[in-house]
């Protein structure tokens, strides 16, 4: 039986993000790495997340914190908004919205980020991200249809 990939593509997991997480393929584009990292969060695969963080981040130091985060979070979906080049060929940005539920709050919440990726020797790595500002009167990203100030922005 085939299983759709959690990243939101219409592909089977083993034809989409699975090969990247298993290490049999290398993500050729930052958006692919972004999607596979989302799947790693869904699967609670700390090793893949650490391996795809830029070496300057020293992500291995956060291993326990990442694992603790897994116990509190259920992921509900990913929407990639934009995939844009950076200032040089080895930099790129991926803007996305990821929906999740935290154990401390039963309501679906959304995380909106513009992630920055750097390439080292044909491998892309996540280095950091910024959260674009959302006005209180904007529609909430979680998909509720409510204004941000009446929903996740409280």
Curated annotation (Swiss-Prot):
Transmembrane segments: none annotated. It comes from the Bacteria. InterPro entries: NTF2-like_dom_sf, SEC_C_motif, UPF0225, YchJ-like_M. Gene3D superfamilies: 3.10.450.50. NCBIfam families: PRK01617.1, PRK01752.1. Belongs to the UPF0225 family. This is UPF0225 protein YpsIP31758_1970.
């Amino acid at each position: 039986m085939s299983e759709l990939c959690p990243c939101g593509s219409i592909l089977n997991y083993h034809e989409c993000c699975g090969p990247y997480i298993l290490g049999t393929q290398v993500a050729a584009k930052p958006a692919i790495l972004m999607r596979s990292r989302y799947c790693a969060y869904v699967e609670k695969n700390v090793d893949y997340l650490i391996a795809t963080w830029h070496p300057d981040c020293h992500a291995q130091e956060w291993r326990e914190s990442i694992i603790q985060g897994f116990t509190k979070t259920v992921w509900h979906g990913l929407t990639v908004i934009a995939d844009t080049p950076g200032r040089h060929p080895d930099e790129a940005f991926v803007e996305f919205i990821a929906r999740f539920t935290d154990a401390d709050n039963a309501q679906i919440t959304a995380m909106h980020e513009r992630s920055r990726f750097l390439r080292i020797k044909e491998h892309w790595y996540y280095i950091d991200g910024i959260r674009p500002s959302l006005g209180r009167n904007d529609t909430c990203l979680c998909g509720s249809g409510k204004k941000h100030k009446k929903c996740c922005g409280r």
